[in-house]
């Protein structure tokens, strides 16, 4: 007799003797009638076998019906499979950005701060990526700790600032997230991090309003403005200056001793497509000292030339930088421009045309710039 014609009671009796999950699934897929009759038995079997591991599978795929059915069958909402990841259904749903599933799990008792094997909690995952802000809101409303940290010691607020997510930063600060934490490796505070990521005006203002000093320093002695310049974050440079950042604040750490924001701008940008032209012009517009000197008596112009940042040197000259300063080695702009690292005929011509002294003796051996050029085999026709 064909199984399809058996009464439901007898079909269930037959399937109760199918110990192999493969055989049971094969029967389930044989017809729509069997699927409707046996699907709940499938959920219950999974719960009986391991507590309901299928719940994690449904959660990771955003299958609301599957999640509800597994919970109805008695699945442990906080179940962890016996693998290295030690994930939960909630962590899976947050990772895959399924807002409705997150809500269902929380409503059914999912622990909002249950961490995986790497100490990653749902709130850290929600604030690290571009997931729905509603997920962050749900987690906080269900008691997730705003200042929890993962293995990397990064808090949810740091993650939200780093990824420039205004709405999440607002939510976290409203739930008393600590705005004064530091990034462990660099000693950067949240304002430094925001500056490095070209953050929005609203984020910058929220952090400042929460008491982060405008000219606070990281482990390298840099202020948020100097960090913004370092990362060629043009928008943030302008925002910080408008909010009152000091463009002439001098770094006091040994290697960078005496550096102001203009020195960072006069260095070759980490962004190969940027020559920091707009940043330099913005700093000068906000009264940055063009001829400020660092510990080795260099000005931003001298530093730009010595480091081969020719485009930056040209911009500094456009802004009115002096060509007369001499560094601690007795070298002028022409000595440095004639060196092998920063040889540029156009720059040499411009410096000479602007009145740079071609006969000034300097450096360790008291040489004129032409000796530097000859030593480095430069074409002197320019």
Segments (PLM) and residue ranges:
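N-terminal Skp1-binding subsegment of the F-box domain
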Residues: 1-33
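Ankyrin repeat domain, specifically the short helix-to-loop turn at the C-terminus of the second helix
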Residues: 41, 68-76, 103-111, 137-145, ...
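F-box-proximal linker/hinge
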Residues: 47-96, 100-103, 107-108
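Ankyrin-repeat boundary/"N-cap" motif
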Residues: 47-57, 80-90, 115-124, 149-156, ...
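Ankyrin repeat A-helix N-terminal signature
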Residues: 57-63, 92-98, 125-132, 159-165, ...
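A generic tandem-repeat structural signature
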Residues: 91-145, 149-162
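Solenoidal tandem-repeat scaffolds enriched in leucines and small polar residues
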Residues: 144-145, 150-169, 174-204, 218-222, ...
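Eukaryotic tandem repeat interaction scaffolds
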Residues: 267-269, 295-298, 302-311, 318-331, ...
């Amino acid at each position: 007799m064909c199984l399809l014609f058996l009464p439901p009671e007898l079909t269930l009796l037959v399937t109760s003797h199918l110990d192999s999950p493969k055989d049971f699934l094969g029967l389930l897929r044989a017809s729509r009638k069997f699927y409707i009759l046996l699907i709940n038995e499938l959920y219950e079997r999974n719960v009986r076998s391991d507590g309901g591991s299928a719940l994690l599978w449904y959660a990771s795929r955003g299958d609301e019906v599957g999640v509800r059915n597994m919970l109805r069958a008695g699945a442990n909402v906080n179940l962890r499979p016996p693998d290295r990841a030690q994930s939960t259904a909630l962590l899976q749903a947050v990772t895959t950005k399924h807002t409705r599933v997150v809500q269902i799990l929380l409503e059914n008792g999912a622990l909002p701060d249950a961490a995986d094997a790497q100490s990653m909690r749902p709130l850290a995952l929600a604030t690290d990526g571009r997931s729905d802000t509603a997920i962050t809101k749900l987690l906080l409303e269900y008691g997730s700790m705003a200042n929890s940290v993962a293995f990397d010691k990064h808090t949810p607020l740091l993650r939200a600032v780093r990824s420039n997510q205004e709405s999440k930063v607002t939510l976290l600060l409203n739930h008393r997230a600590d705005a004064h934490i530091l990034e462990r490796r660099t000693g950067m505070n949240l304002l430094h991090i925001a500056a490095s990521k070209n953050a929005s005006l609203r984020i910058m203002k929220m952090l400042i309003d929460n008491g982060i000093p405008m000219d606070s320093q990281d482990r390298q002695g840099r202020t948020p403005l100097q960090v913004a310049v370092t990362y060629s974050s043009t928008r943030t440079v302008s925002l910080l200056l408008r909010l009152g950042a000091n463009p002439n604040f001098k770094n006091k750490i040994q290697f960078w001793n005496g550096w102001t924001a203009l020195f960072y701008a006069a260095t070759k940008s980490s962004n190969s497509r940027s020559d920091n032209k707009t940043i330099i012009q913005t700093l000068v517009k906000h009264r940055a000292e063009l001829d400020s000197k660092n510990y080795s008596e260099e000005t931003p112009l001298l530093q730009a030339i010595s480091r081969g940042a020719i485009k930056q040197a040209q911009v500094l000259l456009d802004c009115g930088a002096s060509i007369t300063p001499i560094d601690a080695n007795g070298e002028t702009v022409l000595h440095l421009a004639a060196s092998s690292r920063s040889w540029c005929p156009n720059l040499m011509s411009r410096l000479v045309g602007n009145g740079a002294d071609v006969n000034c003796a300097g450096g360790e051996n008291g040489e004129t710039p032409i000796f530097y050029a000859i030593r480095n085999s430069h074409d002197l026709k320019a």
